Each structure stands twice: as C-alpha cells, then as structure tokens.
Amino acid sequence: MSKEIALTLDSRKRLGSTYLKLTKPKVVALMLVTAIVGMSLAPVTDFPWIQASIGLIGIGLMAGSAAAFNHLIDRRIDARMARTHTRPLPSGDTNPLSVAIFAVAIGVVGFVLLYAWVNELTAWMTFLSLLGYAVVYTMYLKRATPQNIVIAGIAGAMPPLLGWTAVTGELHGNAWLLVMIIFIWTPPHFWALAIHRVEDYRKVDIPMLPVTHGIEYTKTSILLYTVLLTLVCVMPVLVGMVGFIYLFSALLLNAGFIYHAWKLKFAPEPNSAIETFKFSIYHLLALFVALLADHYIGMVLQ
C-alpha cells in the first residue's frame, strides 16, 4: 500500500513538474519582477497591497498561459531543435489536448482575477499581451520575418506597464519608459541566443536574423542595440523617476552589456554568444532591482 502511495505521489510530482515547465517559470519570474517595479514606481498614496498581489497572480497566470500556448504551437519545431527537444510535448511527457486545456484554464483564471479584483484596463492589456506573444509572434511573425523579435518585443515588454496600471488603473508616460527599456533590450538578448543556436533555427526554417542576414550582421546589430539601450536606460533619470543609485547601476550594467557585444563582434570566442545571452538576463534583472532600490532608498532619505 505504501509503495502504491509513493508511486502515486511520484507520478503527481512529475505531472506537476511537467505543467510548471510549460509556463516557463524563470521567464515569468523575471517578468513579475519588472511588474513589481512598475507597481512600486507608480504614484499612489495608499498602496493597494491586496489588489497588487492579485494583480501579480493574474499577470503571472496569463504569462504562463502564453508560454504554454507557445509550447503547443511550436511542438513540431521544438522536436527538431537541440535546445528544445526535451520540452514536455516533444519528449512525450504530455499531449497537445492537455496542454491546450491547461493553457486556456490558467489564462481564463488569470483574466477573471484581473478583471474582477484589479481593473478592466489591466485585464484587457494583459490579454492583448498574451495574444501578441502566443498568436501574433508564435503563429505568424516568428515564421515570417527576421524582425520577429523586434516587432513582437512589445508583448514581452509590457509587464512594468501592467504592474503600473494594476495599482493606478491608468496609463502613464513613465510606465511606458520602463516598457521601452525591455523593448530595446529584447533584440540583442534573443539575437545572441540565435547566433549560438543558428544551425537549429536554420534546420527548422525559422528566419532569425543570423539565418537570413548572417552572423556578422547580427553581431553588429547587437552592438548597436546595446548602445541604444544605454541611452534609453538613462531616460528614467532625466524625467525624475529615479536618481543617482539607478543611474550609476544602469551605466555600469550597460557598460558590461556593451563590452560583451563588442567582444562578440570583434574578439569572439566559442562561447561569446551564449555568454552575451546569459549576461543580458542578469543585466535586466539587476537593472530593475536597481530601479526598485533607488526608489525606496530615495523615499527613506527624503
């Protein structure tokens, strides 16, 4: 009897792990960090903790739903790529119908939470972001143009704005600046990975930039985008959102990103592309933590 219980528990753990993987939890976690920053920087006199918490849950569920739809739609090309062939669907850990039901279910729950307990604006904007990633990007742009990441990057850049609207119920230019940071960060982040996995993308006929325009062109594009990103990252300081702590951190982090991009272009080593990709993740996380730290330290010192 105890053996049967142990087997049942083990089976449930594996099932839970499978469905957690479908939501791309690390990606969603980073998105939620940026949403928290959007909430924290929003000008509210009495912070709505319960509303904000429900907002994070709703945004997280809908982001997880978009990720699950991505797994579902891309299952055939995932099976042929070295980076993705062990994902739940290609590996046979689950089936398309179950993934579709799961994606719809958590998406609906997330939307209802946002619509009923946060505000309609956040619910609909999060839904549009889901459509942008799962439908516009995954179903069309990814397979249609090498500018797929550039055009669809807005969908993945929305969490700071969603966090802002979750606690204020309104759009604001400062929140769009946070969106712009992620929007400009996205192409060099993904293009570095695309260089590292260029043969994978070529094999499945996905027109990523290094496949269509060549690796050297892509390296140049990455370097130019990191310079542009540095300029965009200064803008929150110029409008008075944050101060010196963030400015120093942003300049340091962007210098690191430019260094990796420069090295990738002019002094590449076998792992330069994947190292640039990995650094970009730490860059974005640290940048938004710096926004948060500057904001709260500034409040204490006032």
From Swiss-Prot:
Keywords: Cell inner membrane, Cell membrane, Heme biosynthesis, Membrane, Transferase, Transmembrane, Transmembrane helix. Carbon 2 of the heme B porphyrin ring is defined according to the Fischer nomenclature. The chain crosses the membrane at residues 27-47, 49-69, 98-118, 121-141, 149-169, 175-195, 228-248, 281-301. This is Protoheme IX farnesyltransferase 1. It is found in: Cell inner membrane. GO terms for molecular function: protoheme IX farnesyltransferase activity. It comes from Vibrio parahaemolyticus serotype O3:K6 (strain RIMD 2210633). Its EC number is 2.5.1.141. Converts heme B (protoheme IX) to heme O by substitution of the vinyl group on carbon 2 of heme B porphyrin ring with a hydroxyethyl farnesyl side group. It is an enzyme of class 2 (transferase). Gene3D superfamilies: UbiA prenyltransferase. Pfam families: UbiA. It comes from the Bacteria. Belongs to the UbiA prenyltransferase family. Protoheme IX farnesyltransferase subfamily. It is a multi-pass membrane protein. One of its GO terms (cellular component) is plasma membrane. Pathway: Porphyrin-containing compound metabolism; heme O biosynthesis; heme O from protoheme: step 1/1. Its main location: membrane. PROSITE patterns: UBIA. GO terms for biological process: heme O biosynthetic process. It catalyses: heme b + (2E,6E)-farnesyl diphosphate + H2O = Fe(II)-heme o + diphosphate. InterPro entries: Protohaem_IX_farnesylTrfase, UbiA_prenyltransferase, UbiA_prenylTrfase_CS, UbiA_sf.
